[in-house]
Amino acid sequence: MRHIIRKTFMLAAALLLLAGNLRADEGMWLLGRTDKKAMDVARSLGLQLTDAELYGEDGTSLKDCVVDFGDYCSGVIVSKDGLLFTNHHCGYRAIQQLSTTDDDILGNGFVARTRQEERPVEGLYVKVWQRAEDITAQVEDSLQKIYSNQTLGRKLGRQRQAVLYSQYLGRILMDIAAAAEQKAGQDGQKGIVCEAKAFEGGRLYLLNFYRQYSDVRLVFTVPQTLGKFGGDTDNWMWPRQTADFSVFRIYADAQGQPADYAAENVPLQPKRWARVSIDGFDQGSYCMTIGYPGSTSRYLSSYGIDERVNVTNIPMIQVRGKKQEVWTRWMRQDRSVGIKYASKYASSSNYWKNSQGMNEAVSRLGIIEQKQEKEQEIRRWFSADKERRARFARMFPTLKKSYKARHDARYASGFVNETFFRGMEIVNFGRLASTYAASHPNYRQTVVDYMRTAYKDYDPRVDEETMAVLLENYAQQVSSKYIPRFYSVIRKKYGNDYRAYAHDIFTKSKLTTFEGWYGLTNAKVRSSVQIADSLEQAVLDEKAYRQYVESDPAVALAKQVQEMSESVITAPLTRTAPTIAYNENLLTQAVLEMEMDKPHYSDANFTQRMSFGIVSDYTNAGTHHDFLTTMPSLIEKIEKHGDNPDYAMQAEILALLKSHDYGRYADKKSGELPLCFLTTNDITGGNSGSPMFNGRGELIGLAFDGNWDALSSDISFDANLTRCIGVDIRFVLWLMEKWGKADHLVNEVMGK
């Protein structure tokens, strides 16, 4: 009874907070720098950990078991032997890399029965955050020196300052990070990588220290029918029944230090790992995520939001839809293509659908209008003070003018990039070929390594059809100003037969294979760097080399696209970018100053953040959405929608799902197996794989998605609608035990 009373009180407190100025769910907070008011809210909701238990620099706090998974996802260490949980879609690229038609672990799943069977993943790494240093004074001092040197004592105009800030800030931050890494190496610290980043619109700069582990091995994955259950149909939707998890292990050298892959490496022995709870939760239970959210734009101006929706997202949605139709057809008819294109299709379609949801939500919720009202409030605030007027009065007119000035070029740029460099892979290969010779030798090897990997997952038949479809589509979407020269050849020589033109390109180009690409780019390099009889001869060699490379039709096509872009797109984008960035930062600073009495968090930038909230259902447009899904809903989807490939399931797995053999993982109230659940946590891309903790810091799930009704949350958080979707840890462990027969792994996780 006392437990029930406490839960009821916590839920009531949460609802009161949701109605107040400080919402219980909004915020991506920097651990170690979290506002006291925010922490008070977290504790009122059920957080039982001290600040020191959340964040410390000795390796034993909760933040130390949370990892940056490959610089694109999050993950959590769950055992004393470095076992790691993340999402299936985060491990998808690694799983696909290890799959072949003969050993299709993507389709069939994989269980390592012994440590020796765990499979190393080339190029995969994880980073464990160590600490952060405030470098604000150092960055500002460096910027002031640059401003002084550039102006020679004259007054620095705002436009010039914006250009200099944009031009030099990145270099300053990189230099600070590089110096810190070098010092760490000199001090004998292995695997330390540093990143310096801006926060609060440039009011704060932090240097983050990470320990990077480059020997990460696949241990367990379910078949993609479970790990991607629902596919594109259910992506960003609720209710969900996706077993979105995969299991890896971190390895280190014999001394426990980061090391590249070696057979003799041993499992990492972390100082801290997450304990798991299978006790479950209720409506209103405390839930906390810790992870690496990639990017949000909560302080973005109304002009910036309008650009995101109507200029940036529209080309992505339109072109990717065409591309993915071609890819899907090939992937379904040829399993080898299905494996090769699995990861890049998933990445493409994820943001394609997200952009559609964002545009729909921004319109439905009136986000731009809400932001315009906020901007009126800001105008009234700075107009009331002379000093504030001087700083901020030109901010909004400048943003309006600058966004308008780049509108057409930005829109066209979206179609160029999505069509030629993200759509037609051979054109991107051609672009890299044309710049290869001018590259530094060290960078050349990086390009070669990238190309070798890219061609492993490439099928020229698919790309040829994609080229034909996208070339025709591009001509229909942009004005004549943005049409490259080769379109006249398509019209005159091929009679606008795009398939014939594409077939000719692919028949004549050397870039359809890695061997062809490498042979083309290296054919003349050796002779051009030999000691020449004269300087003129050396120059002639380089010229001949470039002519040879550019004679390839795919390279020539890429070059003409770049020439068109440089002629009519690059200038307006380059001219306006510094001004927009500077004034958007200024807007952020204005908001923080105007609301200095309120807790504020910085926009996400792939640094470790904590979000706190509660397990919660929601209602939208009269439809109620429960906070939990259970096994019957999964079985119902499979049986009702068997004609949809996204809901396909192997007969033997369906039999297991129907077995009702849930054991200790069954929900204590319903007796059913919990699958996925909703919370009010504030997440975004990059948070995928983030551990979801209860108030005691015990793992109850893995965050993997947001909900369609609030896909505008990267721009504006709606506490009534925005929900985080997580996979219940009981579903995870049940599948490991019952499908995978991996008792050894379950026991490791449970500490037995």
Across the structure, where does each feature detected by a protein language model lie?
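Bacterial N-terminal signal peptides that target proteins for export
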Residues: M1-M10
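Terminal presequence/propeptide segments associated with secretion/organelle targeting
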Residues: R2, G20-K752
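Bacterial N-terminal signal peptides
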Residues: M10-A19
